[in-house]
């Protein structure tokens, strides 16, 4: 089955499927799944010696304001393989702006059927403060050595904001 056929979720916006592009703690290589072919491409080698603090992927059949599917960070006890799909629950969103405009990153935790470890996390404020700081620090600095690129982290928003972003981006993609 092609990743292109993976639905956005089981019960939007509460129960989503995230297609993983970059595993947590991986080498500083940005991978992207081509949305037309489903192939995993090397997008670029990151200039900074940093790694993604969480698994990084997207929700199929969504369209964020930056023109791409909605980006999602997924903390897990182990790194996930690129191209894998994980069932999740959205808990928050990191609002940012970069050189191209608005760029939000959702945070979602594994669904209870996969692990009970995250059942107590209902909102981004339930995540460990250190993890939130690592995520914000990563995105504030991962483009530092790339000429003409920058990121400004604006802050965290709650689970309801994340769910609203999912619904809006799903509708945006449907109406495109």
Swiss-Prot record:
Its cofactor is Mg(2+). GO terms for cellular component: cytosol; membrane. Mg(2+) 2 binds at residue 71. Mg(2+) 1 binds at residues 66, 71, 103. Its main location: cytoplasm. It is found in: Cytoplasm. GO terms for molecular function: inorganic diphosphate phosphatase activity; inorganic triphosphate phosphatase activity; magnesium ion binding; zinc ion binding. Its EC number is 3.6.1.1. Substrate binds at residues 30, 44, 56, 142. It is an enzyme of class 3 (hydrolase). InterPro entries: Pyrophosphatase, Pyrophosphatase_sf. The keyword Ribonucleoprotein does not apply. It catalyses: diphosphate + H2O = 2 phosphate + H(+). SUPFAM superfamilies: Inorganic pyrophosphatase. One of its GO terms (biological process) is phosphate-containing compound metabolic process. Keywords: Cytoplasm, Hydrolase, Magnesium, Metal-binding. Homohexamer. NCBIfam families: PRK01250.1 (NF002317). Belongs to the PPase family. Catalyzes the hydrolysis of inorganic pyrophosphate (PPi) forming two phosphate ions. This is Inorganic pyrophosphatase. It comes from Escherichia coli (strain K12). The lineage of its organism: Bacteria, Pseudomonadati, Pseudomonadota, Gammaproteobacteria, Enterobacterales.
